[in-house]
Amino acid sequence: MRLSISSTNVKEWSGDVLVVGLPKGDPSTTAVNLESRFPGVSSALNQQAFEGKTGQKLVLHPLANGNPQRLVLIGLGDADAIDLDGIRAAAAAAAQASIGCKGCLGLQLPWDSHHPDHAARISAEAVRLSLYADQRFQKEPEERRLPTALELIGLPASAAAGLEPVNATCAGVELARELVAAPPNYVTPAALAETAAALAHDYGMELTILERADCEARGMGAFLAVSQGSDLPPKFIHLIYRPEGAVKRRLALVGKGLTFDSGGYNLKVGGAQIDMMKFDMGGSASVLGAMRSIGELKPAGVEVHMVVASCENMVNGSAVHPGDIVTAANGTTIEINNTDAEGRLTLADALLYACEQKPDAVVDLATLTGACVVALGDEMAGYWSNNEALAEALDTAADAGGEGLWRMPLRQSYKKGLKSLLADMKNTGPRPGGSITAALFLKEFVSQDTAWAHIDIAGPVWSDKGKGVNPAGATGYGVRTLVNWVCAQA
């Protein structure tokens, strides 16, 4: 999508579809301004009792001949309450109102109380992301008439700087959405490795794929235990972005890569949504999407290592048993008291490997626990961190990306719930505080001197009904936060 700032007055703008946001109480004033160009606007507002309330929308076809072909007025609610999230929601609504029109979408919102760069970026991201639709698996995809260009009306020319990362960031989100949404007979461990190979080729990154024998040689017993019930070979993926010039910061992004999770012998039953366990590789999709964006944006001075331990968790005669004891790459022995808590086993070896790269900070993303969904719902991810500066940076990055993120406690006293009679630790603790003990388990495989954060995306990885910038389905959650975090350190 072509993105630009327009200095043209809204009354003179001549694109294909014009969307104007109206705060509550403002419609009459705006209507007077628009009336000279679009006769009948005032009467239409009165007939529809349009007051500018949040969610109100009025679609007009004001000009019999010429552009714009469509004029859309959307209500924004109280003017004092229009924050950046309100701008984002309004831009998403504008995008939906533009469906059916090709050409250029013009958007005017009350930008004045916001930094121009920020307003431009979030508006453009919201428009592109909310127009996304996945029709790859349909015999006859519906033809969609969509805008090919977006002009933000009324922002200063300097706001164009905010548009520069938008298309690259959104492309990363879209890649993550495609990976999460695709069924597990399409997205396999090998398919994730192929995706990484394509990124390495397209953006000049370095790629290492460890096969089963390589992982055995490195002692990755936790990861391999999860994989042994599947006929599909595991893939351990290490993708590296190296900037031109000196490296000031080295970062690691680790994603959980379970391309299908049956639960193993602790089989998912009842309301466990086994049919949706294709999204258990959502963490790997997020880090792959982030690497796609980073590869295009090329942040200076920041080296980024992406690590994904990918496999399936299946049931056969070779599958891991409840009660088995396995050994991670650092020699830690783990009693598997629940085969459906497999993600943390794969992440244990992935985190150990990531820390071997001597990063300044490690962030892992995983659809790890239902407990986090119960606590925070499906619009927010929870995160745990051992470092205040990293936590603050992630909060800032998530806020800028419009992704809900809430810090959770790393309460050390809960670690006793992971104590095993026979091994160094168990892979699950008691049900209460389950997301906390999961984070404490992961922390055991992070170097003590390494800043680390674990983000549990089990809730926001998928949206059943869609909301805001996310159509129904895979959301691509985490990509914007990661891209913002990495680029902020350039």
UniProtKB/Swiss-Prot annotation:
Keywords: Aminopeptidase, Cytoplasm, Hydrolase, Manganese, Metal-binding, Protease. The keyword Protease applies. GO terms for molecular function: manganese ion binding; metalloaminopeptidase activity. It comes from Synechococcus sp. (strain CC9902). Coiled coil: none annotated. It catalyses: Release of an N-terminal amino acid, Xaa-|-Yaa-, in which Xaa is preferably Leu, but may be other amino acids including Pro although not Arg or Lys, and Yaa may be Pro. Amino acid amides and methyl esters are also readily hydrolyzed, but rates on arylamides are exceedingly low; Release of an N-terminal amino acid, preferentially leucine, but not glutamic or aspartic acids. The gene is pepA. One of its GO terms (cellular component) is cytoplasm. Mn(2+) 1 binds at D261, D340, E342. This is Probable cytosol aminopeptidase. The active site is at K268, R344. It is found in: Cytoplasm. It holds the Pfam family Peptidase_M17. Its cofactor is Mn(2+). Its EC number is 3.4.11.1, 3.4.11.10. One of its GO terms (biological process) is proteolysis. Belongs to the peptidase M17 family. It comes from the Bacteria. Mn(2+) 2 binds at K256, D261, D280, E342. Presumably involved in the processing and regular turnover of intracellular proteins. Catalyzes the removal of unsubstituted N-terminal amino acids from various peptides. Disulfide bonds: none annotated. Binds 2 manganese ions per subunit.
